[in-house]
């Protein structure tokens, strides 16, 4: 499968920004900074401009990879996978974040269709909120992501999304992924206010050599987004140098 994000580590700014002027400023200030590996495009721009137009505007600013996060695609009827993937392919994104919590068939359909279309599926299944799982008062089984990972690997997925807030879970998932996938890529998400830190999460995911971070407000909310991205990348470098 194509590797969308180059290298072994880096920052992927999450462009969940309502104003296009703000988005443009963030991209212009971060696109050439060391360690910025791509961008996550979310629904805020897409609902305003449409997916194809949002991607076009972003392509005018950078040639870095674009990963589309439909907040979160995958928990849907499996037959929607063909339609959804075709539209994303036509819009010229590079990868898709998928949380196929609707069951094994959803994993097969959404991940499988992405691969067949030449898009890279980044598969996850847990978000960093306290009451997501049953043990915290939520509705999802606590081992939902464990089950999704097994099915995703069966479908030849090798890019994964892990929440950054729980060190023990990151260690367990990363070791399992590394033992079952050749040269996997892991993106960690949920930093700052959501409880994750670069230092802790990157050290916890050390079983997987290729580690990236999707970071939103720590970058987009900064008066100097480029400097904020650079600081986070230096934190990554320090973790890997100390390993």
Residue spans for each PLM region:
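Short, solvent-exposed amphipathic alpha-helical segments in soluble enzyme
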Residues: 28-31, 56, 112-114, 175-179, ...
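Active-site-proximal loop/turn and secondary-structure-junction residues that shape catalytic pockets
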Residues: 17-19, 43-47, 72-74, 100-102, ...
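Conserved N-terminal beta1-alpha1 strand-loop-helix module at the mouth
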Residues: 1-67, 75-78, 90, 151-157, ...
């Amino acid at each position: 499968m194509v590797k969308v994000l180059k290298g072994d580590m880096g920052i992927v700014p999450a462009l969940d920004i309502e104003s296009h002027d703000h988005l443009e400023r963030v991209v212009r200030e971060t696109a050439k900074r060391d360690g910025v590996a791509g961008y996550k495009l979310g629904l805020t721009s897409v609902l305003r401009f449409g997916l194809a137009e949002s991607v076009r505007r972003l392509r005018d600013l950078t040639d870095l990879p674009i990963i589309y996060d439909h907040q979160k695609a995958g928990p849907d009827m499996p037959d929607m996978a063909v339609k959804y993937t075709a539209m994303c392919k036509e819009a010229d994104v590079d990868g898709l974040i998928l949380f196929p919590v609707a069951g094994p068939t959803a994993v097969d359909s959404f991940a499988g269709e992405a691969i067949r279309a030449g898009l890279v599926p980044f598969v996850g299944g847990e978000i960093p909120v306290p009451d997501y799982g049953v043990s915290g008062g939520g509705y999802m089984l606590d081992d939902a992501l464990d089950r999704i990972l097994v099915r995703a690997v069966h479908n030849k997925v090798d890019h994964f999304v892990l929440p950054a807030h729980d060190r023990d879970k990151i260690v367990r998932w990363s070791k399992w992924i590394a033992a079952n996938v050749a040269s996997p890529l892991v993106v960690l998400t949920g930093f700052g206010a959501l409880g994750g830190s670069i230092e802790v999460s990157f050290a916890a995911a050390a079983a997987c050599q290729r580690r990236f971070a999707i970071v939103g407000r720590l970058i987009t909310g900064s008066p100097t987004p480029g400097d904020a991205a650079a600081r986070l990348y230096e934190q990554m470098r320090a973790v890997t140098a100390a390993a």
